[in-house]
Amino acid sequence: MLKSASGALANVLKRSLVPAARVTAVVPLRRSHGGPVESDEEFDSRYEAFFNRKDIDGWEIRK
């Protein structure tokens, strides 16, 4: 009985003295690089030009 009481007391003291580990969440955030802003039409034309190339292979498409 003394052994279990001293074990319980040790656990209580350990929890009160050792701070609990805090887990911080990683929040996905995309930051602008300050570069030139591309319009939707420019992006679409660049995207279509990439996939309409004659020398494109399966690896580049999967990337």
UniProtKB/Swiss-Prot annotation:
InterPro entries: Cyt_c_oxidase_su5A/6 (IPR003204), Cyt_c_oxidase_su5A/6_sf (IPR036545). It is a peripheral membrane protein. Keywords: Heme, Iron, Membrane, Metal-binding, Mitochondrion, Mitochondrion inner membrane, Transit peptide. SUPFAM superfamilies: Cytochrome c oxidase subunit E. GO terms for molecular function: metal ion binding. Component of the cytochrome c oxidase (complex IV, CIV), a multisubunit enzyme composed of a catalytic core of 3 subunits and several supernumerary subunits. The complex exists as a monomer or a dimer and forms supercomplexes (SCs) in the inner mitochondrial membrane with ubiquinol-cytochrome c oxidoreductase (cytochrome b-c1 complex, complex III, CIII). Component of the cytochrome c oxidase, the last enzyme in the mitochondrial electron transport chain which drives oxidative phosphorylation. The respiratory chain contains 3 multisubunit complexes succinate dehydrogenase (complex II, CII), ubiquinol-cytochrome c oxidoreductase (cytochrome b-c1 complex, complex III, CIII) and cytochrome c oxidase (complex IV, CIV), that cooperate to transfer electrons derived from NADH and succinate to molecular oxygen, creating an electrochemical gradient over the inner membrane that drives transmembrane transport and the ATP synthase. This is Cytochrome c oxidase subunit 5A, mitochondrial. It comes from Manduca sexta (Tobacco hawkmoth). The gene is COVA.
